[in-house]
Regions:
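Predominantly the C-terminal beta-signal and adjacent terminal strand-loop region
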Residues: 218, 230, 234-293
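Outer-membrane beta-barrel biogenesis signature
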Residues: 19-44
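Solvent-exposed loop/turn segments connecting transmembrane beta-strands
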Residues: 24-32, 52-63, 226-234, 277-281
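Repeated loop/turn-to-beta-strand initiation elements of outer-membrane beta-barrel proteins
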Residues: 44-50, 75-80, 133-137, 211-215, ...
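Outer-membrane beta-barrel translocator/channel fold
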Residues: 60-61, 77-176, 181-184, 194, ...
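Residues on the lipid-exposed face of transmembrane beta-strands in outer-membrane beta-barrel proteins
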Residues: 36-40, 66-70, 80, 123-127, ...
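Bacterial Sec-dependent N-terminal signal peptides
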Residues: 1-26, 293
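Hydrophobic, lipid-facing positions within transmembrane beta-strands of outer-membrane proteins
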Residues: 30-36, 46-48, 62-66, 119-123, ...
Length: 293
C-alpha cells in the first residue's frame, strides 16, 4: 500500500469505526435521513437547484428548499438558499416526585406532540484546495437565519399518584398498602415568535480523483448561535463520514453516517449539556440522490 492510500484509509475508516462503536453506547437516538435533489446549470459557473428532505427520527422533519450557487474560480464558491421546514415538536419529560413528609409519591410524564412550520435562509462561502491531486480540502462558512411565528401546542400531563393506605386487622396489627390514582390533564403551551441566527463552520476532507466515480469523505461542522447575549453560543457539533457515487454523468447517489452532539436548545432556551459527552447523541444514516443537467 502506498503512503497516499494509507493516509486516505486512516482518514476515512478511523472516523467510521469510531462512529459505529459509539452508537452502541449510552441512550443514543438513531434516525434515517433521505434527500432528493435536482440541479440545473445555467452557465458553466452558475447553477440553481431544488432539494427535498425528510428526517425520520424522534423529532421528525420535512423540508423543501431552493438554492443557487456561483463558482468564482476553482478555489471559491458562493451560495444562497431558502428552505421551508415542517418539524415535529415531540417533547417528552418524565415526572417523578416524592411528597415531602410522607411515604406518597407521584410518577408520570408531560408530552407535547405537534408539528409547526419554520422559514430558513442561508448565505455561504466555500473555499477549497486540492492537495496531491487527489485530496480536496474545503472550508464552508454559512450564515443561517431561521424564523418561526408564534404558535401553541397541547401538553398532555399524565400522573399516577401512589398513596399509602393504612388499616388494622382483627388483631389490631397495622396493614399498609399503596393505591394508585391515575389522572390525565391537558394544558395549552404558547411558543413566542423567535428568530435564530447561526454561523456554521464546516471542514471537509474528500477523495477527489479525476475519472474516479467514488468520492469518500469525512467532515466536522460547528453551529454557533449569535442570537443569545453578546457572544457566540455553541449549539451543536456534527460529524459525518460517507461516500458519493456518480454514474451516467448526470446522476449521483450518496450514503453517509452522521453523529450530532446537541449542546443548547435555542427554542426551549435551555442548556442541553455543558460539555461534549459520549451519551445521548443523535446518530443518522443519510441517503441521497441528485440529478444534474
Amino acid at each position: 500500500m502506498t503512503l497516499r492510500r494509507y493516509i486516505l484509509a486512516v482518514l476515512l475508516l478511523a472516523p467510521c469505526a469510531w462512529l459505529t462503536l459509539s452508537a452502541q453506547e449510552g441512550n443514543d437516538e438513531v434516525g434515517v435521513w433521505s434527500e432528493l435533489g435536482i440541479e440545473k446549470a445555467i452557465t458553466r459557473n452558475w447553477d440553481v437547484g431544488l432539494d427535498l428532505e425528510y428526517r425520520a427520527q424522534n423529532k421528525a422533519r420535512f423540508s423543501v428548499g431552493l438554492g443557487t450557487s456561483y463558482k468564482v474560480n476553482k478555489y471559491l464558491k458562493f451560495g444562497l438558499s431558502y428552505s421551508f421546514l415542517y418539524s415535529e415538536k415531540n417533547k417528552y419529560k418524565v415526572k417523578d416526585e416524592v411528597i415531602a413528609g410522607s411515604d406518597d409519591w407521584t410518577t408520570g410524564y408531560n408530552l407535547i406532540d405537534e408539528w409547526y412550520p419554520r422559514h430558513r435562509f442561508n448565505a455561504e462561502a466555500t473555499g477549497s484546495v486540492k492537495l496531491w491531486n487527489w485530496l480536496k480540502v474545503s472550508l464552508r462558512e454559512r450564515y443561517q437565519l431561521t424564523h418561526r411565528r408564534a404558535w401553541s401546542a397541547t401538553k398532555l400531563m399524565h400522573r399516577e399518584d401512589h398513596i399509602k393506605q393504612v388499616d388494622f386487622d382483627e388483631d389490631w396489627n397495622e396493614i399498609s398498602w399503596y393505591e394508585t390514582y391515575v389522572s390525565d390533564n391537558t394544558e395549552l403551551k404558547e411558543y413566542p415568535t423567535y428568530t435564530d441566527q447561526v454561523l456554521r463552520s464546516r471542514l471537509k476532507l474528500e477523495y477527489d480523483k479525476k475519472r474516479c466515480p467514488f468520492s469518500p469523505y469525512v467532515s466536522a461542522e460547528f453551529h454557533n448561535s449569535v442570537s443569545k447575549g453578546d457572544h457566540m453560543l455553541l449549539q451543536k457539533i456534527r460529524t459525518a463520514a460517507g461516500c458519493s457515487y456518480k454514474f451516467r454523468k448526470r446522476n449521483e447517489v450518496s450514503l453517509s453516517y452522521l453523529i450530532t452532539f446537541d449542546m443548547y436548545d435555542i427554542e426551549e432556551d435551555e442548556l442541553v449539556r455543558q460539555t461534549v459527552r459520549l451519551h445521548d447523541r443523535l446518530h443518522a444514516i443519510n441517503l441521497g440522490y441528485k440529478y444534474s443537467f
